[in-house]
């Protein structure tokens, strides 16, 4: 599977792009149903109070950091159980429980074809990455021999059996360059029913 991830600073600009003729016509074309491929478009638009991100550095930020105007500097909400939740502004007054269920708006997932699924409020999206581009031999050996195997096991478990725990989907991916060559960067992208479900898995599940 190939995934392209894009971050938009302005929701209106994203909407205009999405509705532009080249994009909309390609997506809506009946040819997409006969390409022999499956296409997925996942759009998430968290409100500011529902969003947090954390970096160990302040320059050349990857991911959503590339479109942020500024960072908050050093923080204390890190390195202890529950720190992720504490970084959400809304967590001061809200437990962030899901308000409803996933809804199939159109189509039938069992039959394939075009299907539209609507999320619910407080659905949790996590993207957590690893970058060993500048790692030395000792650090690489530590990552590949000790850190990656249990990480891969956990990610595969969530991909294959995570729904019973509240994980809607989970993918562990490697970045590639424009020529398709693997880069020394990887990340997990997971969709969960709630932050609480994610916390419970991270806290107590064997994987």
Predicted segments, located by residue:
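C-terminal functional regions that serve as terminal interaction/effector modules
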Residues: 176-189, 197-207
């Amino acid at each position: 599977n190939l995934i392209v991830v894009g971050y938009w600073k302005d929701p209106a600009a994203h909407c205009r792009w999405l509705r532009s003729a080249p994009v909309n016509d390609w997506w809506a074309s009946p040819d997409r149903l006969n390409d022999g491929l499956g296409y997925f478009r996942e759009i998430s638009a968290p409100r500011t109070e529902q969003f947090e991100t954390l970096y160990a550095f302040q320059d050349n930020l990857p991911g959503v950091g590339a479109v942020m105007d500024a960072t908050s500097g050093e923080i204390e909400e890190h390195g202890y159980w529950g720190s992720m939740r504490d970084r959400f502004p809304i967590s001061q007054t809200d437990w962030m429980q899901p308000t409803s269920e996933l809804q199939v708006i159109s189509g039938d997932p069992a039959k394939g074809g075009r299907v539209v699924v609507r999320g619910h409020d407080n659905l949790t999206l996590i993207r957590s990455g690893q970058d060993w581009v500048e790692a030395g031999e000792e650090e690489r050996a530590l990552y590949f021999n000790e850190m990656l195997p249990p990480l891969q096991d956990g990610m595969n478990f969530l991909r294959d059996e995570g729904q019973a725990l509240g994980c809607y989907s989970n993918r562990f991916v490697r970045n590639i360059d424009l020529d398709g060559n693997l880069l020394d960067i990887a990340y997990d992208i997971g969709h969960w029913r709630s932050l609480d479900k994610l916390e419970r898995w991270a806290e107590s599940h064997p994987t």
